[in-house]
């Protein structure tokens, strides 16, 4: 599995701001969206393009456009929604598919409660978005749902991840690419990332 820890200075600066404990909901949302936008730029650098001819201001001109059915964004509810606008800023024509999962706080395993995928999934590149890749359980479940639709080109975009989760995904799905702003140290006894960002869902939605 290809794992890209994106070390761009803008990403690292904004991630540092995200780690501050006293951010307002508005500030956290804005920064999460900005980092998602930059990760999208990295994750789409290998998309295929094709030549088309359009009418330019001085006559016909040949330009490049992304080839095929393009992209579906797959936010994992609920925290993944906090990254969605940033991705859509870069790919405004992308279709949005949704996966609803919550974590059982005793077993730390994901429980699925909702899924809705766009059409022609087998022809699309899926960009899974979620602020955290912790145990890897939610991502694993989402990948399996996507592959059940026929989707085979899958990438994940995360603000932070830990080696434990990355190893789980690498073992089960070596064909999936991961783009992450930071590979953090470890999980604590409650399954939260350290140093991490805290509870990203609560920070994005202003809940506790």
UniProtKB/Swiss-Prot annotation:
Task: List the catalysed reactions.
Answer: UMP + diphosphate = 5-phospho-alpha-D-ribose 1-diphosphate + uracil
Q: Which cofactor(s) are needed, names only?
A: Mg(2+)
Q: Does the keyword Magnesium apply?
A: yes
Give the top-rank taxon of the lineage listed in the UniProt record for this protein: Bacteria
Q: What is its EC number?
A: 2.4.2.9
Q: Per UniProt, where does 5-phospho-alpha-D-ribose 1-diphosphate bind?
A: 78, 103, 130-138, 199
One Pfam family recorded for the sequence: UPRTase
* Protein name (database record): Uracil phosphoribosyltransferase
């Amino acid at each position: 599995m290809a794992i890209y820890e994106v070390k761009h200075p803008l990403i690292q600066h904004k991630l540092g701001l995200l780690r501050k404990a006293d951010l307002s909901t508005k500030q956290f949302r804005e920064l999460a969206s900005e980092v998602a936008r930059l990760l999208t730029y990295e994750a789409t650098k290998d998309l295929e393009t094709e030549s088309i001819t359009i009418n330019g201001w001085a006559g016909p001109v040949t330009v490049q456009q992304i080839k095929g059915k393009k992209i579906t964004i797959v936010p994992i509810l609920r925290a993944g929604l906090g990254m969605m606008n940033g991705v859509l800023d870069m790919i405004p024509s992308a279709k949005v598919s949704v996966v609803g999962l919550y974590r059982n706080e005793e077993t730390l395993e994901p429980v699925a409660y909702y899924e809705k995928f766009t059409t022609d999934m087998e022809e699309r590149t899926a960009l899974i978005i979620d602020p955290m890749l912790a145990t890897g359980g939610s991502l694993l479940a989402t990948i399996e749902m996507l592959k059940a639709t026929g989707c085979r080109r899958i990438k994940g975009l995360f603000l932070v991840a830990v080696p434990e989760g990355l190893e789980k995904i690498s073992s089960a799905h070596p064909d999936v690419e991961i783009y992450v702003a930071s590979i953090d140290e470890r999980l604590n006894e409650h399954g939260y990332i350290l140093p991490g960002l805290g509870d990203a869902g609560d920070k994005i939605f202003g809940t506790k």
